[in-house]
C-alpha cells in the first residue's frame, strides 16, 4: 500500500487550494480494505498515521473516517475498476455548480482525461442519498450541486489528475465566458 503517494496527493490538493480547512476527502482501495482520510482532517497536514482503514462493508478497522464514507463505499461497491476517489470543494467547479452551468471541455487534455462530466443534484453532505446519486454515475468526473466534485480512477494519481484538469476547465470556462 503506497500511503506515501496518498499523503503527497492530499498535500497537493491542499496546497493548490482544491480544498480549504477540513474540506474534502480522499480514499484508495487495496483489496478488501479502504484507506480514507479522517473526519475533520486538514489534508495539508495529514500524515500516514492519521489515515483510517475500513473494509468494503464499512466496518471500521482504524480511526474515525470522513463523514462521506458512505459515498466512497458505494462507489467502490458499484465500480470494480475504481481504486481511488478524490472529493474536493474546488472553487470554480463549485461556483459553476451553484449556477447550474455545464462546463465545456475546451482543451484536448480535458477531452482525453475528463471525457464527460456527470452532474448530480444537491443532496446533504454525508447522506445515503448523495452516496447513491454519485455512485450511480458512469462518468469518472462528477460535479455535485452546491458542494464540489468527485473524481475516480484506477489509482490515486489518475483521480488527482482528473481533479486538476476539471478545475482548470472550470477556470477556462470562467475566463472565456467573461471575455465574450
Swiss-Prot record:
Pfam families: Aldolase_II
Annotated cofactor note: Binds 1 zinc ion per subunit.
Molecular-function GO term, any one: L-fuculose-phosphate aldolase activity
UniProt GO BP: pentose catabolic process
InterPro entries: Aldolase_class_II_sugar_metab (IPR050197), Aldolase_II/adducin_N (IPR001303), Aldolase_II/adducin_N_sf (IPR036409), Fuculose-P_aldolase (IPR053406)
Gene3D superfamilies for this protein: Class II aldolase/adducin N-terminal domain
Needed co-factor(s): Zn(2+)
Active site: 68 (proton donor/acceptor)
Annotated catalysed reactions: L-fuculose 1-phosphate = (S)-lactaldehyde + dihydroxyacetone phosphate
SMART domains per the UniProt record, alphabetical: Aldolase_II
Metabolic or biological pathway: Cofactor biosynthesis; coenzyme F420 biosynthesis
Residues bound to Zn(2+): 68, 87, 89, 147
GO cellular component: cytosol
Entry's EC annotation: 4.1.2.17
Keywords of the record: Lyase, Metal-binding, Zinc
Residues that bind substrate: 24-25, 39-40, 66-67
Family the UniProt entry places it in: Belongs to the aldolase class II family. AraD/FucA subfamily.
Annotated function: Involved in the biosynthesis of the coenzyme F420 which requires phospholactate produced via the aldol cleavage of L-fuculose 1-phosphate and the NAD(+)-dependent oxidation of (S)-lactaldehyde. Catalyzes the reversible cleavage of L-fuculose 1-phosphate (Fuc1P) to yield dihydroxyacetone phosphate (DHAP) and S-lactaldehyde.
Binding partners and assembly: Homotetramer.
Protein name: L-fuculose phosphate aldolase
Species in which this protein is naturally found: Methanococcus maripaludis (strain C7 / ATCC BAA-1331)
Amino acid at each position: 500500500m503506497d500511503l506515501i503517494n496518498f499523503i503527497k496527493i492530499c498535500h497537493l490538493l491542499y496546497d493548490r487550494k482544491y480544498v480549504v480547512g477540513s474540506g474534502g476527502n480522499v480514499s484508495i482501495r487495496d483489496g478488501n480494505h479502504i484507506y480514507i482520510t479522517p473526519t475533520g482532517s486538514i489534508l495539508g497536514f495529514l500524515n500516514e498515521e492519521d489515515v483510517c482503514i475500513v473494509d468494503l462493508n464499512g466496518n471500521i478497522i482504524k480511526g474515525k473516517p470522513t463523514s462521506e464514507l458512505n459515498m466512497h463505499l458505494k462507489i467502490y461497491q458499484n465500480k470494480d475498476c475504481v481504486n481511488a476517489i478524490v472529493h474536493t470543494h474546488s472553487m470554480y467547479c463549485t461556483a459553476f455548480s451553484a449556477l447550474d452551468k455545464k462546463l465545456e471541455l475546451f482543451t484536448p487534455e480535458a477531452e482525453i482525461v475528463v471525457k464527460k462530466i456527470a452532474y448530480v443534484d444537491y443532496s446533504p453532505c454525508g447522506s445515503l442519498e448523495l452516496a447513491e446519486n454519485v455512485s450511480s454515475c458512469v462518468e469518472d468526473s462528477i460535479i455535485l450541486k452546491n458542494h464540489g466534485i468527485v473524481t475516480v480512477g484506477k489509482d490515486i494519481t489518475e483521480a488527482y489528475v482528473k481533479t486538476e484538469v476539471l478545475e482548470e476547465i472550470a477556470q477556462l470556462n470562467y475566463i472565456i465566458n467573461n471575455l465574450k
